[in-house]
C-alpha cells in the first residue's frame, strides 16, 4: 500500500544512478549542442541546488518536484548533447567524485528501503493492537509515519546525489 508510493522514487533513483558518461557515448544520432543547452544546464543546476535547500529546510514536496524537473532537463541534455559529451573524458578528480556520489546515492537509497521495511512492520503491529491497546497502536502509527517520511526524504536525497553526477558530466556546458 504505502510501499507503492515510494517505488517510483526508488526506481527513478536507480535509473538516474545508472546514467553516466559511458551511457552517453552510446547515443546514435548526433545532435548539435549549443547555447540553448547551456541555458538548460544552468536551469537544471539551479533546480538541483534549490531542491537540496528545500529538502534541508523540510519542504519535501517542493524538493521532490524540483529534483524531478532537474532530472527532466538532464535527460534532454543526455539526448541532445550525448555525442559531444562522449568526446570529453572525465578527469581523475571527476571520476573520483562520480564514484563518491554513486556510493552516497546508493547508501541513501538502501537506508530508505530499510526505513520503509521498518515502517511497514510497525504498521502491521499497530493494526494487530488497534482494538486491544489503543495507546500502543497510536505509538506505532506515529513511528511508522515518521519512518515513511524519513524514507521519502532519503530517496529524494539519493536522487539529488545521482543528479550531481549529471551536473558534473555536463559541466562543460557552463564554460
Language-model segment annotations:
Residues 1-11:
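Bacterial N-terminal signal peptides that target proteins for export
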